Amino acid sequence: MKVHLVLLIAVATSCAAQTNSPSATPAAATPEVSFQFERAGLPVPKFTIVVHEDGTGTYRGEEAPVSGGARAAALQPASPGRPIDRPIKLSPPTVDAIFKTARSLDHFNIPCASKAKNIADTGKKTLSYSSPDGQGSCTYNYSENKSVTQLTETFQAIAFTMDEGRKLDFLHRYDRLGLYSEMDVLIHEVQEKRALEVGNIAPSLTSIVADEALMQKVRERAAKLLAQANDSGSKSN
């Protein structure tokens, strides 16, 4: 009986020690930059990209609700859009540029929205910075600050790539003939730097390259993009 009691005390002591161990202490916050975007009428009307200084991050959003048209909408509400939650990994040059710009803009503690009137609605955007060394955010539709504009273009180009990856997956499964023109679109956007960090959709491209049932030109385009992504990754390491 005494032995049993001693064992119980030992187990309890061990559990208490584990509870109070340093490993249970919450990890210190690490620097992160986020970009939020909202604009009704788009396939993805709302999304958020979060980037940590080690290059890891997330792309989260929600696809637009699916509706069967005005008549169907009168009978029942549109189905909610599917949630999007994807991990991302950005190259060191992109990460360095993002954090360097954020710090040069006082962690976004600046008035970044343009005061000009009659500007077209291009979507509500919010840049945020959070870290032990400071935090801040600014919201805008359009900004005349060149650094803010450049960051906006970077994040939107990353979002485009992520959305394109989902589109390629869909076409690969349901509309293989549509892959031909879509690959042309993606290659063009990469050339124009409106699609960045293509390595994040490498699984989608690899799946296309490996599918011998697809058109050879489609597979060649996917292989070309994969090679470019791998080349960019090796140069940044």
Residue ranges of model-derived segments:
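Short, well-ordered, aromatic-rich surface patches in folded extracellular/luminal domains
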Residues: 16-41, 111-237
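Bacterial N-terminal signal peptides
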Residues: 4-14
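Charged, amphipathic alpha-helical segments
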Residues: 91-116
